[in-house]
Amino acid sequence: MNLPIYQTDPATATRYLFFTGKGGVGKTSLSCATALKLAEAGKRVLLVSTDPASNLDEVLETHLTNAPTAIVGVPGLDAMNIDPVEAAAAYRERLIGPMRGLLPEAALRNMEEQLSGSCTVEIAAFDEFTALIGDPEAAKNYDHVVFDTAPTGHTLRLMSLAKAWDQFLDTSTSGSSCLGPLAGLDKQRAIYEATVHTLADATATTLVLVSRPQSAALNEAQRTSGELRDLGVGNQRLVINGVFETNCPDDVTALALQRRGIAAIEAASAFINSLPTSIVPLRPVNILGVQGLRILLDEGSSSIAKPLPNGWSPPAMESLEDLVADIERQGNGVIMTMGKGGVGKTTVAAAIAVMLAKRGHSVHLSTTDPAAHVAQTLAGQVVGLTLSKIDPAKETAAYQEEVMAAQGAAMDAAGRSLLEEDLRSPCTEEIAVFRAFAREVGHGTNRFVVLDTAPTGHTLLLLDASEAYQRELERQARSTQPEEVLKLLERLRDPAFTRILLITLPEATPVHEAADLQEDLRRARIEPFAWVVNQSLLHSGSSDPLLQGREESERRYLSEVVATHSTRTAWLPWQAEEPTGPDALARLAVSSLKPAIPTKKP
C-alpha cells in the first residue's frame, strides 16, 4: 500500500488539532513536531498536554507548567501542561475558598472530602481544557492550539465529558453531586456549549488518529475513530507512525519487522482507505529535543545512524523465567504489570500467566485497561488459566443497582431521584471499577491473579482511589464493605502477596515514566518486585543501519535501568513474530530462558 509521508500544511491546518491513539504510538512526538512545523512557518502556536502521564517536558526538553511557556529556539511556539492534580486543587479552592470563615471547619472538611475523588481531577482538567477552546479570550493570541491528548481510554472520557456534563447540567435539580456544588460548573455553561460546538466543527477542529504498523494499535485507532465520530468529531485523519522499510534483503530481523508492519497495514486496509492516511518512517534515534523533532518529519533523515561504539559491555539482567520461578514459590498471590502505554504490559502479563499455568498452577488473568487488548494477545485457551475483563459499564450498572436496592427502598420519590442523580456522576464508574479491581486482588488468596493494568496515569488514579474510596462510600451511606475492599491497600503493600512488575522499553520516555511511577508507588509504601525491559534489539544481529542506530540508542537506557532505577531487572528481546495467542507467548517464555544478556547471579 503506497501511502504519503505525513506533512503539516500551515495554509490548510485547522485552528485546533487533537492527537489521539493507543498508548505509546507517538502522539506526543507527532503533536510536538506538528506544532514546531507550524511555528517555523510563522504561525503562533500553543501546544497543550491534557495527559495525566504527560511526557511533553521530556520531548521538548523544557520544564512546563499549567501556564504557556516559550520554547527556546522556536519563536512563536509556547507549550503548557494541564496537570490534573494541580487543576483539581485549584478547582477545590475556587469552590471552597469563598466559604472559608463563613462555614464551620467541619463543613469545609466535608466539602474537601467530596471534592477529593478522581472524577474531580477529571472535571478540573476538563475545565481548563474547555477554557482553551470555548473561551474566545483564552487563546486569542494563537493561530493554532495543538493538543497532545492522553492514551485512548482517557481521551475518550475527556472528549465525552463535553456532552455528558452538558446533559448533566440540563437535568440537575439538586445543585450538588460528588463533584461538589454544580454552581462551579454552571458558571462555565456557555464555554462548555462552545466547546461541544467547536469539537464538531470540521473547519475548526482536526482529530489526528496516531497509530503504529501493528494490529492492536490500528484496531484501537479504528475503534476510537468510530466512537469520536459518534460524539460529533468528524474531521479525522490517520497517521501511521514508525513505518519501517529495509534495504537489507538478507537481514532476518529487518525483514521480519518490515513484514509484520506490511501485514498489519494490509489487514486494516478498509479502515485506512476510509479516511485521509499518511505515514511517518521509523527513525534511528529516540525523538527528544527540537532537533530530534525536526528529524521526525524530515523525509531525508531515515538513513541517519550513529556507528556502534566498541567496548560497551551490557549490564547483567535476569530472564523472565527467573522472575516466574521466584513468584511461583509462594503458591498464590497477585502479579501486576505497570508502565507507560504501549510498552507491552499485556504481553508480559499474558506470558507470565501462561508460564504459571503451564507449571500446573491455577491462574486468572484480568484487565482493568479501558482499551482491553488482553483478549487479542491471548486469543486461545490454556489449561488452568481463566481470563476476564473488568467492564466499566457493566460494573457501574451493577453498582448502581446495588446501591439503589440497599438505600432506595426506604426513600420517598424525591430521595430516590436524588440518589439516582448522584449515581449518574462519573465518580460512580471509578468506584465501581475500583470495587471490581479489589475483588480480583482478593481472589489471589487461593490462586495466582495476574492483572494487566491500564497505562500509567489511569493506574495511578486507580491506586490513589484506594485511600479515598472509604470516604466516598461512606458518603453514599453504604452500611458494610466487602472484605476485599477493606484489605486492598494492605494487600498491595505486602511484597509476599503482591508483585508489581514495571514494564518498560529501552527508550528515554518509557524508562523515565516507569521511574516516576516507581516513586509514586513508593510514596504509597508499595515497592516494585522487578523491572522488565521489553522489545530490546540488543544482539539482534541486524545489519540494517537504521536498526543498528536503534540498538545503539537503547544501550544507555539498559545501563540506566540497572544502575539507577532497579534492584532486579529482566530482559526480553524483540520478537520476529508478534506474540499473540498462547503458542506465541510460550515461545516468548522460551526465548526469555536464554537471554543474550548474562543472568544476574543470586
Question: Which stretches of residues belong to each language-model region?
Answer:
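C-terminal lobe/tail of nucleotide-utilizing enzymes
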Residues: 1-11, 63, 195-332, 493-498, ...
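P-loop NTPase motor core
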Residues: 47, 54-120, 372-424
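Walker A/P-loop NTP-binding active-site region of P-loop NTPases
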Residues: 18-82, 149, 159-163, 342-395, ...
